[in-house]
UniProtKB/Swiss-Prot annotation:
Record-level GO cellular component terms: cytoplasm
Reaction(s) this enzyme catalyzes, per UniProt: cytidine(34) in tRNA(Ile2) + L-lysine + ATP = lysidine(34) in tRNA(Ile2) + AMP + diphosphate + H(+)
Subcellular location: Cytoplasm
EC identifiers of the protein: 6.3.4.19
Official protein name in the record: tRNA(Ile)-lysidine synthase
HAMAP family, per the entry: tRNA_Ile_lys_synt (MF_01161)
Residue numbers binding ATP: 24-29
Length: 430
């Protein structure tokens, strides 16, 4: 089956109303763009096949500007709208990883509802991905490599060229007289993927002509086995993960280590996190899951933090220390730090009504300066019929996790705490 008819059949099965093509300007994505342009002309779609393209300008090469212009010229030729998005690459975890993260986050920003991202990964890419997973010591999920349709970074992705080799794409490009750019970094074997592509895999293909197809079969076996495990664990997983970013630990200790790690991996995958290594997962289980009950353990995983409180794991972002903030309320609206939103105040004849997120509290008017602070230690009287109690005990009774306690706006009249917005009022002086 040729490229055009195969992709045509794939698109007939797709439920998307539009397609966003990831266009680098290289051979693979240029072929993909050409195929979609042909399909749009060939198929009597009512409405017409909706196709857009996006080019990510990483700024890593001195040729990046000329690549962007090439992509624009290409899209003008095919009459396909193009988005050019410039990104900053965080090189903390390596250029490859940083560029990939920046690329997909930029694409996610532009992907529309009912639109699917289309990438030009082919059979040779699949082999490289499998070997890189093997190098990392990945399990079934990693060795499952890429699927023709999947979800990545929360985006639906279609890879219609996954069953074709690079040679087949080259033959098509030459037949259609297509022009494409070549990234000079492709020859740099310091990058693992380039080392495999340029040094290792050509020798394996020379020895075994159908090596890529064999790797694809193995990857598919791994994917199917992982799907089977997920199916078998689905009932248990539903019991432990009733809220997406939380994981209940009740009965968890009774499971085998294999079942524990499988369930945690499912939870991390549900939250679209990269899979931790086996060492990291073991550390998570030992240091967080099974930490002492009174402990407040946490585990950093890329840009997220896993915390435990009252027999439950929580997935949060890293939080800033807000305890030194003292914000004067001089207008009706105050912007709070660390993405906590706005706190606003309304006034009537006798009272001030403070609003924050879905919470509100009504306090008497005052001539004292009003400030918003975070974090407090000491005893307060939060109930008319109860004596003063340590604020830590109050938070515990309200089941507020330790890391959230210092993120709740505290209203002060002068130097006197009057309320933790949405949780309690203070009824006496201290």
């Amino acid at each position: 089956m040729d490229l055009l008819s195969d992709i045509e059949k794939q698109l007939q099965k797709a439920t998307a109303q539009g397609f966003l093509i990831a266009l680098s300007g290289g051979l693979d994505s240029t072929v993909l763009l050409s195929l979609f342009a042909k399909l749009r002309q060939k198929q009597p779609h009512l409405p017409p096949l909706s196709v857009r393209a996006i080019h990510i300008h990483h700024g890593l090469s001195p040729n990046a500007d000329s690549w962007a212009k090439h992509c624009q010229d290409l899209c003008d030729q095919f009459q396909i709208p193009l988005i050019i998005e410039r990104v900053q690459v965080d090189k903390t975890n390596g250029i490859e990883a940083g560029a990939r993260e920046a690329r997909y986050q930029a694409i996610k920003k532009h992907l529309q509802t009912q639109e699917i991202l289309v990438t030009a990964h082919h059979l040779n890419d699949q082999t490289e991905t499998f070997f890189l997973a093997l190098k990392r010591g990945s399990g079934l999920q990693g060795l499952g490599a890429m699927q023709q349709q999947s979800v990545l970074f929360g985006m639906p992705i279609l890879r219609p060229l996954l069953g074709f080799t690079r040679t087949q794409l080259e033959n098509y490009a030459q037949k259609e007289k297509l022009n494409w750019i070549t990234d000079e970094s492709n020859g740099d074997n310091r990058f693992d993927r380039n080392f495999l592509r340029n040094e290792i895999l050509p020798k394996l293909r020379e020895r075994w002509a159908y090596f890529d197809l064999a790797v694809q079969r193995s990857a598919q076996h791994c994917f199917e086995q992982q799907q089977l495990i997920n199916d078998l664990l689905s009932e248990a997983f539903a019991e432990h993960c009733q809220i997406k970013n939380q994981f209940k630990l009740c009965q968890f200790r009774k499971y085998s280590l294999a079942k524990q790690t499988a369930l945690l991996r499912m939870w991390l995958a549900e939250n679209q996190l990269e899979m931790p290594s086996k060492r990291q997962l073991t550390q998570l289980i030992n240091d967080v899951v099974f930490a002492k009950e009174e402990a407040n353990p946490q585990f950093q995983l890329v840009n997220k933090v896993i915390r435990r409180y009252q027999d439950r794991l929580y997935l949060t972002k890293p939080f800033s220390d807000l305890t030194k903030y003292c914000l004067k309320l001089e207008q009706n609206t105050l912007s709070l730090p660390d993405d906590l939103g706005n706190l606003s105040v309304q006034e009537n004849e006798h009272n001030l009504i403070f609003h924050w997120q879905d919470f509100s509290v009504t306090l008497e008017k005052t001539n004292l300066p009003i400030s918003i602070r975070f974090g407090y230690s000491g005893k307060v009287k939060h109930h008319l019929k109860r004596p003063r109690e340590d604020i830590k005990k109050i938070w515990q009774e309200l089941s507020v996790p330790p890391w959230e306690r210092n993120r709740i706006p505290l209203i002060f009249y002068g130097n006197k705490l009057k309320s933790a917005v949405g949780f309690f009022r203070v009824f006496d002086e201290y």
